[in-house]
């Protein structure tokens, strides 16, 4: 006889899906749940999830939108195959509940669970629900939102975006005083951002080295180019391919220059960190711009569309913040006020209600 409730988390592709899933998984594991993962073997979750102590099963599925006619025509066959693969996994795991957090595996996994009578909880991190989640919401017992308005359905519940406990536990942000260097963190997401990698070394070269302390996450495969960009301009910067301890990086920084993935926006709010957002222009339904607007509307961040991005625009903002730390402090306080810090607990509680 089983004593533990069993959960399969379906989340993958990017850190924006995986890390919120891990936050909920950790919370439920502490409560005695048995948690495993469903994902794809060629995406981030394949390496990241086992490192955090969770078993992962794989199904064969890839994105459909914007990937050409051949893939579109083959999609029904691939989807049916992946649903049967997911059914096999769920049967083997003797699952009580599945939690869909986004990524390629969520759709087939959610439909497989529904077909087996296993309750599905869906969480949409972005301000605009993606295609997979719009479909999966029809098969879900609970539909949860990171941002208000992501779903038009009246049954959708606003819970916020789960973030890691170590971020919630960070002390209240204190912005550096004007007599010391401004600490700037540049993050292009887990995969990097070429436009930030290319532009920021030139931007910082227009200031004295004493003005800024710089930490720059280049993304996988871009370290050497970014490091060279700073060195050629005689700019001191701590360049890292991937920052493994993001809690310490957030705690260190006064300001972030970054994309506007849902997880990034949620994390910045929780830690009270002002931001210059440069949303990914190719994001489906322009959801990153809508994510960023949440903090911009609270006067906790500023936004520069990539098509309007210039070295001068970023330099002007940096000069403003360099000379006006009170403004950054006010933005920090407004950011923290906008945070939903109990999102992880809310999702975990809803999981417990259904089993």
From Swiss-Prot:
Enzyme Commission number(s) from the entry: 2.4.1.227
Membrane topology reported for the UniProt record: Peripheral membrane protein
InterPro entries registered for this protein in UniProt: GlcNAc_MurG, Glyco_trans_28_C, GlycoTrans_28_N
SUPFAM superfamilies, per the entry: UDP-Glycosyltransferase/glycogen phosphorylase
UniProt: UDP-N-acetyl-alpha-D-glucosamine binding residues: 14-16, 126, 164, 190, 243, 262-267, 288
Catalytic reaction annotation: di-trans,octa-cis-undecaprenyl diphospho-N-acetyl-alpha-D-muramoyl-L-alanyl-D-glutamyl-meso-2,6-diaminopimeloyl-D-alanyl-D-alanine + UDP-N-acetyl-alpha-D-glucosamine = di-trans,octa-cis-undecaprenyl diphospho-[N-acetyl-alpha-D-glucosaminyl-(1->4)]-N-acetyl-alpha-D-muramoyl-L-alanyl-D-glutamyl-meso-2,6-diaminopimeloyl-D-alanyl-D-alanine + UDP + H(+)
UniProt-listed CDD domains: GT28_MurG
Pathway(s) this gene product operates in, as recorded in its UniProt entry: Cell wall biogenesis; peptidoglycan biosynthesis
A GO MF term: undecaprenyldiphospho-muramoylpentapeptide beta-N-acetylglucosaminyltransferase activity
Record's keyword terms, sorted: Cell cycle, Cell division, Cell inner membrane, Cell membrane, Cell shape, Cell wall biogenesis/degradation, Glycosyltransferase, Membrane, Peptidoglycan synthesis, Transferase
Domain of life: Bacteria
Localization terms from the record: Cell inner membrane
Protein's UniProt keywords contain Nucleotide-binding: no
CC annotations in GO: plasma membrane
Role according to the record: Cell wall formation. Catalyzes the transfer of a GlcNAc subunit on undecaprenyl-pyrophosphoryl-MurNAc-pentapeptide (lipid intermediate I) to form undecaprenyl-pyrophosphoryl-MurNAc-(pentapeptide)GlcNAc (lipid intermediate II).
HAMAP family: MurG (MF_00033)
Family, similarity comment: Belongs to the glycosyltransferase 28 family. MurG subfamily.
Protein name: UDP-N-acetylglucosamine--N-acetylmuramyl-(pentapeptide) pyrophosphoryl-undecaprenol N-acetylglucosamine transferase
Encoding gene (name): murG
């Amino acid at each position: 006889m089983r004593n533990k409730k069993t959960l399969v988390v379906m989340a993958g592709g990017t850190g924006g899906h995986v890390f919120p899933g891990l936050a909920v998984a950790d919370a439920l594991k502490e409560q005695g749940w048995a948690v495993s993962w469903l994902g794809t073997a060629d995406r981030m979750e394949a390496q990241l999830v086992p490192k955090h102590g969770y078993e992962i099963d794989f199904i064969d599925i890839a994105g459909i939108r914007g990937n050409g006619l051949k893939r579109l025509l083959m999609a029904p066959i691939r989807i049916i195959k992946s649903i049967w693969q997911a059914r096999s996994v769920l049967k083997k795991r003797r699952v009580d509940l599945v939690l869909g957090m986004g990524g390629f595996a969520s759709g087939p996994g959610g439909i497989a669970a529904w077909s087996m009578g296993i309750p599905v909880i869906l969480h949409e991190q972005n301000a605009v629900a993606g295609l997979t989640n719009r479909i999966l919401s029809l098969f879900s017992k609970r539909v949860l939102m990171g941002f208000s308005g992501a779903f038009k359905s009246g049954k959708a519940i606003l819970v916020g975006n789960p973030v890691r406990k170590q971020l919630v536990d960070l002390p209240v942000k204190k912005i550096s005083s004007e007599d010391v260097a401004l600490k700037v963190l540049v993050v292009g997401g887990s995969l990097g951002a070429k436009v930030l990698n290319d532009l920021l070394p030139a931007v910082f070269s227009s200031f004295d080295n004493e003005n800024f302390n710089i930490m720059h996450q280049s993304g996988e495969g871009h370290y050497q180019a970014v490091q060279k960009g700073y060195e050629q301009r005689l700019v001191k910067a701590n360049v890292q391919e991937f920052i493994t301890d993001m809690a310490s990086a957030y705690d260190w920084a006064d300001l972030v220059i970054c994309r506007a993935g849902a997880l990034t926006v949620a994390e910045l709010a929780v830690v009270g960190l002002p931001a210059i957002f440069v949303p990914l222009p190719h994001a489906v339904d322009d959801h990153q711009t809508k994510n960023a607007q949440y903090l911009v509307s609270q006067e906790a961040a500023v936004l520069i569309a990539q098509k309007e991005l210039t070295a001068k625009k970023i330099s002007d903002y940096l000069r403003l913040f360099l000379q006006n730390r009170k403004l950054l402090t006010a933005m920090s306080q407004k950011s923290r006020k906008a945070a939903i810090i109990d999102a992880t607990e809310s999702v975990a509680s809803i999981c417990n209600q259904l089993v």
